[in-house]
């Protein structure tokens, strides 16, 4: 069967109680394509997960933006995968570029997190992507492959994994990633999965685009054959997120 | 992003003002009072309990809990009879703060276990100080040994976190402490003072700071820290503050013990002159034991 379009909204370190209420209201009232066509996940900060989970329409799922690498215990400040499961939070974003660069998360650490989260029953949005320096040195696929390998060495079942490609080189650098550039990496990554994991995993795993996605460019990106959806940043806090979700219909057109 | 709720900010600011007034009232009026004997200093501290010298007990739940276990613990805490002259704070994981805030008695304040170093924004997985204020969280634990040694947070990063949190009116439990290898190399005070210096380089107003000494050397190493060993470090830290910050800050600030504290040893620890309370680990997950630890403030009074 075809890969179901996937749209995740990463709110990052944003939101107040009032803003969260407004965003949830927009999401609850928005006209969105059916769950047969698109899978939608939103990812608030930890402190807002319970309220979003309780107020959000059931067709839209909730994700945490991170979790701890192993079982909970003496790890002050961390939230464990089993805590998320206990609160019925089904998804988690792991290996986001901001955590790799600002919090020093290594490929192996991210791989261990993905494996542990899956072992506890979470579904994972696993992020990969290269910096400007890496791209300009011609290392794009080497970097993305190494990041993906650190995950594939630690897991067997990819059913509950969505891979998000973040063109870090185009985030805050003044560069703009074109849909063709996104497609090129997605295609390369899918080929890597086919060669290093299996043809079945390559065919069934959703590879979503985690670059700058807006109401204006979402349809063109969605039309690319190996772009299976988005991990949306700032636009996920705005009404245009509804339009981005509905770009899923481009795939069935 | 939008500024935190003006109501919450204003409320916390007023609390901060009251605390600052308390500090001034508690400070020695004349230099010669600094030479007061031990028993007189203890008596003074009891009298000053209405100010910032008040006994302080924080419960750090760490990365523990389920919806049900949190509910049970909150019920136990709500049912406990707590002594009046002690500040009590609990620190649930981020994901349970909402549940705790909605069900716990307001006699007990709530802390986060960590916070981001600056304003919120593109920092996936982090929580900002503005967000803590927005959800009614009054405190944050910073520099905990598990974040220093497991996560890799360095002194300067932690110092900047403290400065930013305070600037947003979040009160700070600032943690310091040395590893076993550091202690055995005779570097206890070097390490603690270096950690203190990183806080002092960043903090300008200490009114909303509590210092927690964690004898990391006795955590999971088979060693046991005695009340005398705790007192020795607490007294040295207070002296360091007196020399490097000011005598007023040194006398007004709470220095709490973050080693292994339980219902059996809390009374003995509380009697030590420079131990102003506790940052409790595992025992804070047991409601009745934690209440006993909170109420060990009475041992402080007996000692005085």
UniProtKB/Swiss-Prot annotation, chain A:
Q: Does the keyword Membrane apply?
A: no
Tell me where it mainly resides: cytoplasm
- What more does the record tell us? In plants, there are two types of TPIS, cytosolic and plastid.
Keywords on record: Cytoplasm, Gluconeogenesis, Glycolysis, Isomerase
Please give the pathway this protein is involved in: Carbohydrate biosynthesis; gluconeogenesis; Carbohydrate degradation; glycolysis; D-glyceraldehyde 3-phosphate from glycerone phosphate: step 1/1
Catalysed reactions, as listed in the record: D-glyceraldehyde 3-phosphate = dihydroxyacetone phosphate
Gene of origin?
TPI
- Spell out the family assignment given in the record's similarity comment: Belongs to the triosephosphate isomerase family.
Detail which positions bind substrate.
Answer: 10, 12
Q: Name one GO biological process term.
A: glycolytic process
EC main group: isomerase
The entry's cellular-component GO terms read: cytosol
Q: How does it assemble?
A: Homodimer.
Give the GO molecular function terms. Answer: triose-phosphate isomerase activity
Q: What is its EC number?
A: 5.3.1.1
Q: Where is the active site?
A: 96, 166
> Where would you find this protein in the cell?
Cytoplasm
Under what name is this protein listed? Triosephosphate isomerase, cytosolic
């Amino acid at each position: 069967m075809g890969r179901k379009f996937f749209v995740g909204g990463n709110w990052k370190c944003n939101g107040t109680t009032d803003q969260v209420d407004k965003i949830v209201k927009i999401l609850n009232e928005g006209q969105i394509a059916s769950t047969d066509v698109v899978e939608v996940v939103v990812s608030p900060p930890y402190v807002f997960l319970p309220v979003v989970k309780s107020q959000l329409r059931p067709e839209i799922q909730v994700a945490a933006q991170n979790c701890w690498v192993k079982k909970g215990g003496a790890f002050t400040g961390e939230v464990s995968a089993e805590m998320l499961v206990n609160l019925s939070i089904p998804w988690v974003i792991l290996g986001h570029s901001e955590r790799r660069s600002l919090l020093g998360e290594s490929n192996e650490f991210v791989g261990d997190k993905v494996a542990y989260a899956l072992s506890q029953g979470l579904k994972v949005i696993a992020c990969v992507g290269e910096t400007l320096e890496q791209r300009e040195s011609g290392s794009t696929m080497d970097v993305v492959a190494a990041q993906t390998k650190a995950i594939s060495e630690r897991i067997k079942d990819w059913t509950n994994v969505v891979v998000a490609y973040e063109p870090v080189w185009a985030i805050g650098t003044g560069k703009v990633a074109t849909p063709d550039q996104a497609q090129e990496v997605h295609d390369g990554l899918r080929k890597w999965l086919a060669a290093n994991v299996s043809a079945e995993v390559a065919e069934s795993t959703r590879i979503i685009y985690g670059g700058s996605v807006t109401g204006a460019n979402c349809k063109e990106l969605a039309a690319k054959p190996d772009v299976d959806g988005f991990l949306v940043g700032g636009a996920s806090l705005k009404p245009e997120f509804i339009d981005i979700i509905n770009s899923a219909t481009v795939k069935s057109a | 992003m939008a500024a935190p709720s003006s109501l919450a900010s204003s409320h916390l600011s007023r609390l901060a003002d009251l605390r600052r007034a308390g500090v001034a009232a508690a400070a020695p009026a004349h230099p010669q009072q600094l030479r007061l004997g031990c028993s007189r200093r203890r008596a003074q501290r009891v009298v000053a309990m209405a100010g910032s010298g008040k006994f302080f007990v924080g419960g750090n739940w760490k990365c523990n809990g389920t919806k049900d276990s949190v509910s049970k613990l909150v019920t136990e805490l709500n049912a406990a009879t707590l002594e009046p002259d002690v500040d009590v704070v609990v620190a649930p994981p981020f994901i349970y703060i909402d549940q705790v805030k909605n069900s716990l008695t307001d006699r007990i304040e709530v802390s986060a276990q960590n916070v981001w170093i600056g304003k919120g924004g593109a920092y996936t997985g982090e929580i900002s100080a503005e967000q803590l204020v927005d959800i009614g969280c009054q405190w944050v634990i910073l520099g905990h040994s598990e974040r220093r040694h497991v996560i890799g947070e360095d002194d300067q990063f932690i110092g900047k976190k403290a400065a930013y949190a305070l600037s947003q009116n979040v009160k700070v439990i600032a943690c310091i402490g040395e590893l076993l290898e550091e202690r055995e190399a005779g570097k206890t005070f070097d390490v603690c003072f270096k950690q203190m210096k990183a806080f002092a380089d960043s903090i300008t107003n200490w009114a909303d700071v509590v210092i927690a000494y964690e004898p990391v050397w006795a955590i999971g190493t088979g060693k046991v820290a005695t009340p005398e060993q705790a007192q020795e470090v607490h007294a040295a830290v207070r002296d360091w503050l007196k020399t490097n910050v000011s005598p007023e800050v040194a006398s007004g600030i709470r220095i709490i013990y973050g080693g292994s504290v339980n219902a059996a040893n809390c009374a003995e620890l509380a009697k030590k002159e420079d131990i102003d309370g506790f940052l409790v680990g595992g025992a804070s997950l047991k409601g009745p034991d934690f209440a006993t630890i909170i109420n060990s403030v009475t041992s402080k009074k007996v000692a005085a």
